[in-house]
Amino acid sequence: MSGIPTPEDLAARTARAVAAAVGAGRDLGLEVGDPKVLHDVFSVVVHLAPSPVVVRVPTVLPPALRADPVALHRRQRDELDVVGWLAEQGIPVIPPSPLVPRSPVARDGFSMTFWRFVEIEEREPDYARNAASTVALHEALREYPGELPFLSSYQGAIGAGLDVLEGRPDLLAPADLERARGEWARLEPVLASREGFAETFPGVAVQTVHGDSPPYNLVHTTSGDLHADFELVTAGPIELDLAMIGPEAEDAYDEAAAELGLPTLDRRVLAVVNAAARLQAVACLALVPELPILAEGLKPALDLWRAAPPTA
């Protein structure tokens, strides 16, 4: 593969992101003496210790967002607005930090968001239980008063990723790329607009959803379980949040929803968002030149996609 960053390159990128977060925090009046990197994959997540503030600095972005800082700012703005609103309703979330203005901050080529620091409790995740807890999150999000774009996590991401892979047979074999393009050509008309979705699935409700598997993004803290990482928050069907979660978790969601008299999952919609999620994994190979660990990390998802029948 060509153009793969060295460990030194990756460490330098992380250091730049940390420096930007520290500088932005200090400019906003925060005390920062001992910044700690909590996470470093698609974003560098920094605790600005001793302040109870965590900064998320995206460093590896899909091609469409990398080329459009305004779109990135808008997505971050949406996340802060939705999560701030949820916190005000008493929904268990990791909220935006109350110590700084609730707005993305641009510095040194990065755009970052500021969140309250929480103490993590190490615990084996129970995804079926987490899926059941997503029902209450969906009930709350159904009332969100703001306007959000429809299925924004798909818009530009899959098509642009496949475009990048067109010239990278070292990342994706031409036969795989041809299959992926064919599948996306069939899915895109359904997922690209509310109108296309409604035509295929008449009567299926669209609402505000988390956008990135809340069962996998439920954080266990010393003060309880908190929903987190709403970076892909969007308008869409509830099924989007249960994509690729598996039958046990799907059933747990349905049981919890039925007990409350709330909508259960539509398996037809779930099949479509599962197919799109598999294609997202394929398109994510376009990010390997920026994040080499993805090459290994994506293998299980790619094997699953190759083993599945092509999307009709």
Regions found by a protein language model. Give the residues of each.
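Juxta-kinase regulatory segment immediately upstream of eukaryotic protein kinase catalytic domains
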Residues: 1-32
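A cross-family kinase active-site recognition segment
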Residues: 2, 121-182, 206
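ATP/Mg2+ or Mg2+-diphosphate-binding catalytic cores
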Residues: 2-9, 152, 161-171, 283-312
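A conserved alpha-helical element in kinase catalytic cores
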Residues: 11-19, 57-108, 124-132, 136
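ATP-binding glycine-rich phosphate-binding loop
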Residues: 28-49
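A glycine-centered beta->alpha junction motif in the catalytic cores
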Residues: 59-63, 108-124, 163-174, 278-296
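Active-site Asp-x-Gly
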Residues: 208, 219-271
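Catalytic-loop signature of eukaryotic-like protein kinases
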Residues: 212, 216-218
